């Protein structure tokens, strides 16, 4: 679902708040293909310029063409390790949606 992001500003748990900038920076610089694939798989949107923007415990927001899309995880995470596992899961299951 496309969201404008303004209506969904719940506070992050401390563990995610502390790690958010690092996770977002790492994903955008080293794993942008996974973000692009997730956007394509979950929303049918093909955008090589898609970027991870904001995190929540059950997923993250992807920006694409001035829209925000919420990429949902299969569960709510309660630690950085669980968050990493969900990101890896997305990379694995959505690999077939990579855009050449």
Which ranges hold each PLM region?
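Binding-site signature for planar aromatic cofactors or substrates
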Residues: 1-100
């Amino acid at each position: 679902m496309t969201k404008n992001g303004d209506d969904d500003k719940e506070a992050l748990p401390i563990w995610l708040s502390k790690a958010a900038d690092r996770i977002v920076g790492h994903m955008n610089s080293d794993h942008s293909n996974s973000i692009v694939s997730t956007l394509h798989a979950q929303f049918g949107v093909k955008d090589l310029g898609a970027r991870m923007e904001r995190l929540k415990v059950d997923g993250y927001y992807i920006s694409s063409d001035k829209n925000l899309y919420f990429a949902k995880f299969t569960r709510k995470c309660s630690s950085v390790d669980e968050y990493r596992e969900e990101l890896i899961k997305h990379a694995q299951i959505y690999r077939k949606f990579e855009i050449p």
